[in-house]
């Protein structure tokens, strides 16, 4: 006997079945790739895209949205783009570019996206942070009053750098800019300062050599190397500086001190210019886009010394009573010593001072080739170690007077005694400021050398034997006054007892004649 259903039962069954069906509504924002060339993709039909948003492309590749136009989006591909074709589907992700952060990155070499490229396996961190971030506000900042020792006599005495400062290293190619920055990184061993070295647009062989030198000097353990080599795309070279800054900020935000080197921002500006021109943005001076100043200012403003309140707020009370800092050493390469070019003037105006390295000094054998006349540190003076501040006052004056008199003495037939003495003192100060690469000097040894030249102990030492005398003097104090040297290095203090010990020790060493 057949079962009969009346219409109301049928409609009830259908209604129940419909109610049981769960349809998950999924909203997708998709567009179509209309052109691919030189690492730039144009996408039609994407709506609600953020500036700097990650756009998903086929084969697990991504692009960064930079141009938001009326009916299309101009984006730069991160990595290879050979597999992309016109008509490919592009999707928004709702995410800004993030990179891995954390202490696990120390001792590693990563690319601009934070992916390890040193063959040592995964990083072992799940923490990430956005590459672009607003710099700490004025309220959260503290004044710079703690030193960052570079280990260079000329820098620590005349152009001191403080924690949270931005100090530009500027000069022509092959004047020792990278060498100075690497020595500063090496000198942080044992100080607790974490370092980030960002290599932008350099040869892979050069970066490999730097990593090897850091390892040999025991500095790689406290350093992250971010490498965007010359063979990588302009997008990777542009992003790398911000990625490195994010990795350094991790330590600053948690009440620690970090040092970051950008080597160099000239190449980053060139990479950004390339991207901007390919995106058809209007060119300005030297064909750079109008926002090239903002490119560097938003990066360098993220270097700061932040207050205890900032650290406590950021860590939600887990870290209290500690200030954090990120010190930046940006490098700029000039062409034929022209510091009035567009990018050098921009970065000089953003930073808190500059160390100017000169080709003529470098070729004359004065290395580091620091031009003390136009090098300056605007905020580092208040962070300088007490003993160095006390002793180094006469160094800059001696050098300035020497340069002035040396130019004048070329035209004078005979010189009076006072002028001759000033010239000889200047010669000795210039010679004493020379220093070998990968040989950073401790505070006590710097103080010893400066004290000896200021007090006239080196006036009777031949100029060509000065560096040998200095080396012997340091060895003599290490053997006979080890406790004093350790005390000065630990406290950075200066008193009559230390001065008396310096006088006695230098006089003793001079009588040995073992130099």
UniProtKB/Swiss-Prot annotation:
PROSITE patterns: ATPASE_ALPHA_BETA. It comes from Stenotrophomonas maltophilia (strain R551-3). One of its GO terms (molecular function) is ATP binding. This is ATP synthase subunit alpha. Produces ATP from ADP in the presence of a proton gradient across the membrane. The alpha chain is a regulatory subunit. CDD domains: ATP-synt_F1_alpha_C, ATP-synt_F1_alpha_N, F1-ATPase_alpha_CD. The gene is atpA. Belongs to the ATPase alpha/beta chains family. It is found in: Cell inner membrane. Keywords: ATP synthesis, ATP-binding, Cell inner membrane, Cell membrane, CF(1), Hydrogen ion transport, Ion transport, Membrane, Nucleotide-binding, Translocase, Transport. GO terms for cellular component: plasma membrane; proton-transporting ATP synthase complex. Its EC number is 7.1.2.2. It holds the Pfam family ATP-synt_ab.
């Amino acid at each position: 006997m057949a079962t009969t259903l009346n219409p109301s039962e049928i409609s009830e069954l259908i209604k129940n079945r419909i109610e049981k069906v769960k349809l998950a509504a999924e909203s997708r924002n998709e567009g179509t790739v209309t052109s691919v060339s030189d690492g730039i993709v144009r996408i039609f039909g994407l709506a609600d895209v953020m500036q700097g948003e990650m756009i998903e492309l086929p084969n697990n590749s991504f692009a960064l949205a930079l141009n938001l136009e009326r009916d299309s989006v101009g984006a730069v591909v991160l990595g290879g783009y050979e597999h992309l074709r016109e008509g490919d589907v592009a999707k928004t992700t709702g995410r800004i570019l993030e990179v891995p952060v954390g202490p696990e990155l120390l001792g590693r070499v990563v690319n601009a996206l934070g992916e390890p490229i040193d063959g040592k396996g995964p990083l072992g961190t799940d923490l990430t942070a956005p590459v672009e971030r607003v710099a700490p506000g004025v309220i959260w900042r503290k004044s710079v009053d703690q030193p960052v020792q570079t280990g260079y006599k000329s820098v620590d005495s005349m152009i001191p750098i403080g924690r949270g400062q931005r100090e530009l290293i500027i000069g022509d190619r092959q004047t020792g800019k990278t060498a100075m920055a690497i020595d500063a990184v090496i000198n942080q061993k044992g100080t607790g300062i974490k370092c980030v070295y960002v290599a932008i647009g350099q040869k892979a062989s050069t970066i490999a050599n730097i990593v090897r030198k850091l390892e040999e000097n025991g500095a790689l353990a406290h350093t992250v190397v971010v490498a965007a080599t010359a063979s990588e795309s302009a997008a990777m070279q542009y992003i790398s500086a911000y990625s490195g800054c994010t990795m350094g900020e991790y330590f600053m935000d948690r009440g620690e001190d970090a040092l970051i080197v950008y080597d160099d921002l000239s190449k980053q500006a060139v990479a950004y210019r390339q991207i901007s021109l390919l995106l058809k943005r209007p060119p300005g001076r030297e064909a750079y886009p109008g926002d090239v100043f903002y490119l560097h200012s938003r990066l360098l403003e993220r270097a700061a010394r932040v207050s205890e309140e900032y650290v406590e707020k950021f860590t939600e009370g887990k870290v209290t009573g500690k200030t954090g800092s990120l010190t930046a050493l940006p490098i700029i390469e000039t062409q034929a010593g022209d510091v009035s070019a567009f990018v050098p003037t921009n970065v000089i105006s953003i930073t808190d001072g500059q160390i100017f390295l000169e080709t003529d000094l470098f070729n004359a054998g004065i290395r580091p080739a620091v031009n003390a006349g136009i090098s300056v540190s605007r905020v580092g003076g208040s962070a300088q170690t007490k003993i160095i501040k006390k002793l180094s006052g006469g160094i800059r004056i001696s050098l300035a007077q020497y340069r002035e008199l040396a130019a004048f003495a070329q035209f004078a037939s005979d010189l009076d005694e006072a002028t001759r003495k000033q010239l000889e003192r200047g010669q000795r100060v210039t010679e004493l400021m020379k220093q070998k690469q990968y040989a950073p000097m401790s505070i006590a040894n710097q103080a010893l050398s400066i004290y000896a030249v200021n007090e006239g102990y080196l006036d009777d030492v031949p100029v060509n034997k000065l560096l040998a005398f200095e080396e012997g003097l340091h060895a003599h104090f290490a053997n006979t006054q080890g406790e004093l040297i350790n005390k000065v290095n630990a406290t950075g203090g200066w008193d009559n007892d230390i001065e008396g010990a310096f006088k006695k020790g230098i006089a003793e060493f001079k009588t040995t004649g073992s130099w």
